[in-house]
Each structure stands twice: as structure tokens, then as C-alpha cells.
Amino acid sequence: MANIRKSHPLIKIVNESFIDLPTPSNISAWWNFGSLLGVCLALQILTGLFLAMHYTSDTATAFSSVTHICRDVNYGWIIRYMHANGASMFFICVFMHVGRGMYYGSYTLSETWNIGIILLFTIMATAFMGYVLPWGQMSFWGATVITNLLSAIPYVGTNLVEWIWGGFSVDKATLTRFFAFHFILPFIISALVAVHLLFLHETGSNNPSGLVSNSDKIPFHPYYTIKDILGLLLLILMLMLLVLFSPDLLGDPDNYTPANPLNTPPHIKPEWYFLFAYAILRSIPNKLGGVMALVLSILVLAIVPLLHTSKQRGMTFRPLSQCLLWLLVADLLTLTWIGGQPVEYPFITIGQLASILYFPTILILMPISGIIENQLLTW
């Protein structure tokens, strides 16, 4: 009898994806984030399922139901905070994962990269709708401000916003549909993840050298399963430190005030992982221009493979491109900081400068540095 691991139709798929998968022997810890994202997704679905058992998506009771989860449900507080802070860990891993792809030229695997961009948009939509559900002040006003941006679309904008709201303002209908979408989207994300992996396993993984590694591969298990477990332990350590010692560190105090349409908070801002895009949006005085810049700040990733001018795949041996990538990281950190600051001098100016720097770095400076480095190779 043949090994069931290799002959059973279902187990064979798992075997070829996680056990006998030929993997480059030199991939570093930067390749851990894919598996960590899978764990984050599973954790979010699991904690979210238990939260959904006790949550009510009605404007009159939503805030109270979240309070009830934290106070009265067995271990409800830890489930709620694991879900809220799990989203932060999810986005930390997403940013690391995308940054790895940029640094090592993984974007040359175009199908995998493009599915990844669709995944990023879907994850961001899910997180945004999840932030609305507790129905605190920042939930309500965040939903109002962000959905209202669609009114900048010519001709259909206003109708589109009212269609999304299900009325003339963010109200009961909005909350109910956001809960429905927030529940279904993680399963759509899971399906997209399967497609992401399907495309990845068609070509095989990239590696730090950027060279073809067909001549030097090792089985995924036990080498990388052990390595992934180490990464997982560190992730759980960070998450539980956050959940058990300062669960509200990354949240907004305004969200502990029930939503009130008659009282606007002094500073409306989204969760920290959207602040870079929010800062770009705010730095453009024109509404439509701001919305376009907001979308393009993520969509620009789709153009990155087309702008690859270097003869080398990764940035491992390209110091000039490395400098530019770290400049981009610094710029994104600056934008994240600015997004959380009030709209006043000097923050407006800093935000505008950081936004101006963001797009040319990716669209102009990086391709030019690739050309210069090609010249240096023949110098």
C-alpha cells in the first residue's frame, strides 16, 4: 500500500503544499510572515466567530453588547482583545510581507503579487468594517467620514454613498450590512489565500539571492515547519503581551463613548494601520484628488513589477535601491505619525512633503536607481 500522505486525493494536496514542498535552502526569517498571516487569519476567524455569538448589530444595542462580552461572557474580554489586537498583528505581518516582496523582487511573480494586492484591499475593507461594529464615537464618525469620500466620485457619488449607507446617514441599516460583510469577507479572504498559494507553488518561492534555486531545494517539513513554529511563538508572545498588559494601547479612547451623531470628536482618525493612507488623503486640499491618492497609495504596488529596470531580481546586491527602499519605509512611518496628528501647522506641511516624496520614490527614483546600478555592473 502506498503512503496515504502521497496517494489520498485530499491529503496529497496538503502534502504537496506543506510537507514535501521543495523550498529554497536559503530563505530567511523574512519568509516567515506568509505562514504567520495564515495563523492570524485563522485566529481572527475563530475569535470573530465567538464574538459574533454574543454581538448584536443594532444601533441601540451594539455598544452594550460589546460591553456585555467584556464583562459577562466567560473569557469574553480576552476574546475581544485578541480579535482587536490580532488585527494589528495581522497588519504588522502584512506590511512586513509586502516589504519583503519589494526588497527581494518577489513582485516578479506577477500572478502571486497581483492576488496579494487584491488580498490587501480585501483585508483593509474587512478591518475598516470591523472597526465600525463596536459603535463607539470613532466607529461612527470613522464610518461617516470614510464612506462619505465616495461622494467625490463625479455624477454617481452621492447616490453611491446613500446606497452604501442604506439611508441618508450612517444608521441601523449601515451597521447591519457592515456586520454581514465583516462576517463573510474573511472567508472570501481564505479563498483568495488558496489562490495566492496556488500561483506561488506554480513557480516556486523566491529567495534572498534572487537567483533560480532549482538546484538547491530542501523539503518544507521539518526544516521550515520548525522555523515557522519559532516565528509563531514570537507572534503569540507579542500578541499576548499586548492583550494582557495594554489591550487599549493601539485603540482610541473615543471609542469607549457610545456613538452620538450630534457630537463630533475633535480628531477623527482610523486605526493606526490606515494612518499612512489617511495622511496622504488629508494632505491634498481637493476631495476627489485626495480620494484618488488614497486608492493609488496601495494600487501603486500593481505598477511596481512594470517598473523593474534592474538586471538583478532582489536588492541584496543593490545598495542604491536599498537606500531608496529604506527611505520609503521612513516616509511611511512619517505618514503614519502625521495621520494621527491634528490638522494644523507644522503637521500639514510635513504630511504634504511626505506625500510628495512617497509616489516619486516608487515611480521614478527606484527605476532610475535600477538603471544606474546596471551601468555600475559594466563599469
UniProtKB/Swiss-Prot annotation:
Among the GO molecular function terms of this UniProt record, one is:
ubiquinol-cytochrome-c reductase activity
Could you tell me which SUPFAM superfamilies the record lists for this protein? a domain/subunit of cytochrome bc1 complex (Ubiquinol-cytochrome c reductase) (SSF81648), Transmembrane di-heme cytochromes (SSF81342)
Instruction: Keywords in alphabetical order, please.
Output: Electron transport, Heme, Iron, Membrane, Metal-binding, Mitochondrion, Mitochondrion inner membrane, Respiratory chain, Transmembrane, Transmembrane helix, Transport, Ubiquinone
Q: How is the cofactor bound?
A: Binds 2 heme b groups non-covalently.
Name its cellular compartments. Answer: Mitochondrion inner membrane
Origin superkingdom: Eukaryota
Annotated residues that bind heme b b566 are located at H97, H196
Positions of a ubiquinone binding: H201
Kindly list the biological process annotations in GO that this record carries. Answer: mitochondrial electron transport, ubiquinol to cytochrome c
Q: Kindly name one Pfam family recorded for this protein.
A: Cytochrom_B_C
Write out the transmembrane intervals: 33-53, 77-98, 113-133, 178-198, 226-246, 288-308, 320-340, 347-367
**Binding residues for heme b b562, per the UniProt record?**
H83, H182
Q: Which cofactor does it need?
A: heme b
- What CDD domains does the database record attribute to this sequence? cytochrome_b_C, Cytochrome_b_N
- The signal peptide here is none
Q: How does it sit in the membrane?
A: Multi-pass membrane protein
Q: How is the quaternary structure described?
A: The cytochrome bc1 complex contains 11 subunits: 3 respiratory subunits (MT-CYB, CYC1 and UQCRFS1), 2 core proteins (UQCRC1 and UQCRC2) and 6 low-molecular weight proteins (UQCRH/QCR6, UQCRB/QCR7, UQCRQ/QCR8, UQCR10/QCR9, UQCR11/QCR10 and a cleavage product of UQCRFS1). This cytochrome bc1 complex then forms a dimer.
Kindly give the PANTHER family that the UniProt entry links to this protein: CYTOCHROME B
- Similarity comment: Belongs to the cytochrome b family.
Other comments on record: Heme 1 (or BL or b562) is low-potential and absorbs at about 562 nm, and heme 2 (or BH or b566) is high-potential and absorbs at about 566 nm.
Q: What does this protein do?
A: Component of the ubiquinol-cytochrome c reductase complex (complex III or cytochrome b-c1 complex) that is part of the mitochondrial respiratory chain. The b-c1 complex mediates electron transfer from ubiquinol to cytochrome c. Contributes to the generation of a proton gradient across the mitochondrial membrane that is then used for ATP synthesis.
State the protein's name: Cytochrome b
Recorded source organism is: Cryptoprocta ferox
Q: Which gene encodes it?
A: MT-CYB
